[in-house]
């Protein structure tokens, strides 16, 4: 299915109409004179010239580029000052200022920091490349595959969040770089879809159109009209839009005779306390008995607008219905899916949130997460020892929740088992979680936060030795050793470890399968035996061992590289980092032999 946004395919061609002169003297692109009429050969020559300039921009070797545009995530886009200065008055001024700064600071290269140029709206790498390619070639590229498409296979990718985000980012950059013809094009694209997007995305479009001001008046007026007639509540308006825009919307609602319900004082106080991350104040307000968390939609508010810790702390009070719906018909899980925060989704599911609940429009939390996540992000399987992208994690968690009823849940280890068996269980759990932290850091961190691992005491070999538990000192091999017994201080750690592993198996089966493969003790034990094995069986075992060894090598090489880099930048912290590295090896030395 062709997922190209309408209008992009045609805009990638140069025709005589593409160069009709206008009276717009603010354009960064030089136009032909009005009396000039392009013939067939002229068009072909311009296409060839455009292709040549574009190939220079796309050259993988930077092709004599002498400046860089630095994005907020640290990535850099190389470009040629002579080209951008000739094509764009904005870049001509910006680069002249950057060169003066370079000369005064004796820096090696001219760099423009995008966060200093485009401060009001976050933009991504692909939109930056699209706009710069336009400045080079005067042609609008189609969106990169998977960037303007969501992860929902049933979506037509016209008005989903990735498609809207890409258009907004290009529009904003065109506004910042003063490219009016690109503003006109993308404003038209957004006007075509603004009636099809969900109302939450309309708020985002309205905010950006307001930033662009007069350059996007048609889009601004249309978004205002939609929001005025919508049922978007005051809290959402105040948290999403500038104060003057909120006032204008309220005034227009009153003029039309529409009801404008005010937020109750006691509800507002709860929200203000949450904004201040003050859970204790929330408790005091609830004791006054003027409102409760459900009536105030406090959990919805915290999940949507507060930091993750505040939202999870509020959830731990167990005073709110996790399946309660707000006036828009959303459950808390729906809101968490919109925010794309894995830890919040995990916390809500653990507290009993239903993933099967649908919005008034018929969307489940999984559908919301998919439609908010780029296809390229969701299809990108993360490498081991690398952090996973949040959007993909959210989709993965919610997909597993859909299958949960078909999968039997693991029973946490009981304390009423043989001492030696319990000891080995503790060591296995500790090793498994330590290995998960190395191979799948993002997934492990999310599970550990929910399992409340922080604050529990780590199990190490010396902490489980009978000598330490009894307080005696071994003086000879003949001294009788007291049997292992678990201390009360270790029980919380055991529960947290078990919970972490359970969450991993429940929500991250992809990661758990790799850990199961490594933690399979029988597999490793058999590698040490087998005198009567056939040559084929020995080869299979050798291959199996090499697979496990390679996985472990990769994990530790990443860890050592990180520690090495840290030691170069901070000699003081290198000592503590080295200690951390030894600690990691010690944890993995718990493995049975």
From Swiss-Prot:
Domain of life assignment: Eukaryota
Location of the BTB domain: 65-144
Zinc finger motifs (C2HC NPR-type), residue ranges: 147-161
UniProt-annotated binding residues for salicylate: 432
Effect of residue 55 to A: Normal binding to SUMO3 and subsequent sumoylation associated with its localization to nuclear bodies and elevated levels of defense genes expression (e.g. PR1 and PR2) leading to severely retarded plant growth
Chain intervals with Basic residues compositional bias: 583-593
Annotated consequence of substituting residue 150 to Y: In npr1-2; loss of SAR induction, loss of expression of PR genes and increased susceptibility to infections. Defective interaction with TGA factors (e.g. TGA3) and consequent disruption of transcriptional regulatory activity
GO terms for biological process, alphabetical: defense response to bacterium; defense response to fungus; extracellular ATP signaling; induced systemic resistance; negative regulation of defense response; plant-type hypersensitive response; positive regulation of DNA-templated transcription; protein ubiquitination
Annotated consequence of substituting residue 281 to D: Abolished interaction with TGA3 and consequent disruption of salicylic acid (SA)-induced PR1 gene expression
Keywords on record: Activator, ANK repeat, Cytoplasm, Disulfide bond, Hypersensitive response, Metal-binding, Nucleus, Phosphoprotein, Plant defense, Repeat, Repressor, S-nitrosylation, Transcription, Transcription regulation, Ubl conjugation, Ubl conjugation pathway, Zinc, Zinc-finger
Pfam families listed in its UniProt record: Ank_2, BTB, DUF3420, NPR1_like_C
Consequence of substituting residue 59 to A: Normal binding to SUMO3 and subsequent sumoylation associated with its localization to nuclear bodies and elevated levels of defense genes expression (e.g. PR1 and PR2) leading to severely retarded plant growth
GO-annotated molecular function: salicylic acid binding; transcription coregulator activity; zinc ion binding
Effect of residue 393 to D: Reduced salicylic acid (SA)-induced PR1 gene expression but maintained interaction with TGA3
Record flagged with keyword Cell division: no
ANK repeats: 229-258, 265-295, 297-324, 328-357, 361-397
Function field: Salicylic acid (SA)-binding substrate-specific adapter of an E3 ubiquitin-protein ligase complex (CUL3-RBX1-BTB) which mediates the ubiquitination and subsequent proteasomal degradation of target proteins. Transcription cofactor that represses gene expression in the absence of salicylic acid (SA), when attached to negative cis-elements (W-box) with WRKY transcription factors (e.g. WRKY70), but stimulates gene expression upon activation by SA, when sumoylated and attached to positive cis-elements (as-1) with TGA transcription factors (e.g.
Family (UniProt): Belongs to the plant 'ANKYRIN-BTB/POZ' family. 'NPR1-like' subfamily.
Protein name, entry field: Regulatory protein NPR1
């Amino acid at each position: 299915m062709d997922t190209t946004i309408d209008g992009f395919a045609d805009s990638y061609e140069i025709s005589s109409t593409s160069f009709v002169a206008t009276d717009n003297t603010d354009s960064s692109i030089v136009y032909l004179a009005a009396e000039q009429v392009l013939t067939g050969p002229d068009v072909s020559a311009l296409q060839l010239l455009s292709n040549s300039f574009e190939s220079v921009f796309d050259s993988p070797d930077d092709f004599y580029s002498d400046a860089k545009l630095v994005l907020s995530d640290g990535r850099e886009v190389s470009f040629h000052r002579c080209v951008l200065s000739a094509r764009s008055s904005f870049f001509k001024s910006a680069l002249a200022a950057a060169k003066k700064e370079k000369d005064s600071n004796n820096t090696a290269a001219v760099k423009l920091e995008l966060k200093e140029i485009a401060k009001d709206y976050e933009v991504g790498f692909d939109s930056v490349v699209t706009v710069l390619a336009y400045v080079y070639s005067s042609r609008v590229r189609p969106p990169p595959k998977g960037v303007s498409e969501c992860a929902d296979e049933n979506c037509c990718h016209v008005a989903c969040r990735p498609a809207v985000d890409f258009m907004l980012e290009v529009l904003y950059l065109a506004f910042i770089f003063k490219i009016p013809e690109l503003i006109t094009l993308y404003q038209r694209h957004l006007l075509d879809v603004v009636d099809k997007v969900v109302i939450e995305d309309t708020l985002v479009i309205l905010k950006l159109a307001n930033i662009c001001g007069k350059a996007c008046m048609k889009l601004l007026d249309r978004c205002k009209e939609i929001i005025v007639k919508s049922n978007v509540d005051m809290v959402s308006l105040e948290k999403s839009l500038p104060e003057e825009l909120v006032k204008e919307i309220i005034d227009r609602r009153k003029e039309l005779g529409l009801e404008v319900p005010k937020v109750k004082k006691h509800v507002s106080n709860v929200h203000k306390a949450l904004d201040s991350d003050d859970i204790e104040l929330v408790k005091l307000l609830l004791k006054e008995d003027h409102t409760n968390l459900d009536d105030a939609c406090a959990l919805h508010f915290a999940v949507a607008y507060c930091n993750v810790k505040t939202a999870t702390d509020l959830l731990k009070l167990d005073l709110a219905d996790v399946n309660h719906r707000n006036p828009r018909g959303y459950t808390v899980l729906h809101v968490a899916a919109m925010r794309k925060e894995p830890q919040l989704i995990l916390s809500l599911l653990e507290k009993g949130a239903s993933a099967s609940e649908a919005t008034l429009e018929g969307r489940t939390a999984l559908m919301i997460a998919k439609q908010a996540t780029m296809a390229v992000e969701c299809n990108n399987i993360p490498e081991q020892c690398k952090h996973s992208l949040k959007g993909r994690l959210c989709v993965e968690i919610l997909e597993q929740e859909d299958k949960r009823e078909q999968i039997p849940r693991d029973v946490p280890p009981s304390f009423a088992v043989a001492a030696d068996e319990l000891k080995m269980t503790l060591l296995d759990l500790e090793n498994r979680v330590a290995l998960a932290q190395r191979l799948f850091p993002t997934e492990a961190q999310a599970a550990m936060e929910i399992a409340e691992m922080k604050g529990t005491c780590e199990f190490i070999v010396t902490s489980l030795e009978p000598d330490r538990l009894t307080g005696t000192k071994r003086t000879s091999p003949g001294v009788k050793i007291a049997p292992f017994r678990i201390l009360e201080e270790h029980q919380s750690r055991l529960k947290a470890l078990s919970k972490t592993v359970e969450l991993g198996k429940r929500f991250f089966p992809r990661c758990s399968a790799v850990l199961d493969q490594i933690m399979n003790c029988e597999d490793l034990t058999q590698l040490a035996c087998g005198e009567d094995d056939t040559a084929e069986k020995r080869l299979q075992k050798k291959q199996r061992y090499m697979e496990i060894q390679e996985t472990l090598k990769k994990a530790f090489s990443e860890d050592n590289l990180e520690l090495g880099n840290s030691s170069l930048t901070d000699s003081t912290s290198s000592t503590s980092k080295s200690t951390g590295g030894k600690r990691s090896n010690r944890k993995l030395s718990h493995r049975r032999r």
